[in-house]
Amino acid sequence: MGALTYKPYNRIVNAGDINDINILANEVKKILNEDYSGSLEILVNKGGSSGGARPKVLLTIDNEEWLVKFPSSIDPSDIGQIEYQYSLSAKKCGILMPETKLFENKYFGVHRFDREGKKRIHTHSASGLLYASYRLPSLDYTELFKAAIALTGDIKEVGKLFRQMVFNVLTHNRDDHAKNFSFVLKNNTWSLSPAYDLVYSYGFNGLHTTTIAGSGNPTRENVFEAAKNVGFPLKKAKEIFDEVYEGCRGIIKLNI
């Protein structure tokens, strides 16, 4: 991922081109059902899992790089449709998103923002930058805002993060851990990456994994307090909140 590359110590035999997403999905199901007969080799050859809660593969489709997700054994059958709807809602709310689409059988796919043709875009997660655990709650959004200011020197990037935070709060995306926020380096300038992994979810004990002004179950007051903690203009914060609220109204159940 990002601009880093690596090669396995041992040579992996190429299993050939597999263009049928359904075949890959069936191999995922075999692994989840503990039938490993050949499944791991097929998935590794197609890019393997890129981490996260759901099985994923990295695919090249029409010379474009995509990440395609498959349901885990505990996901609802329409999880792909749900995440796709979230991605459309996020765009409507003014959040920078990569291109997304539903592949056959409702598998959710996202265009990789760390690739521009053959060019690799250097990408670093908040987890890596701040040495913050993504397995356990380790951050507050205030710390993310401060990191954005320190890295980019641009208060507008804080506004982008604040908008994403509001979306996460309003749409109950509580698995907002430290690896779900990244920064990209282009032309020697850092900026917040497009948003990803936006979907209805629970964090530890049902709370936000990244707290909002110290609260895992935030109120509006907590939301604006987080902005105040880093000197982000309250007027602008309220404008963003209202824009996201209106963008989600009637599409996704609001949670504040």
Pin down the residues of each PLM region.
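Phosphate/dinucleotide-binding and metal-coordinating scaffold of catalytic cores
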Residues: M1-I256
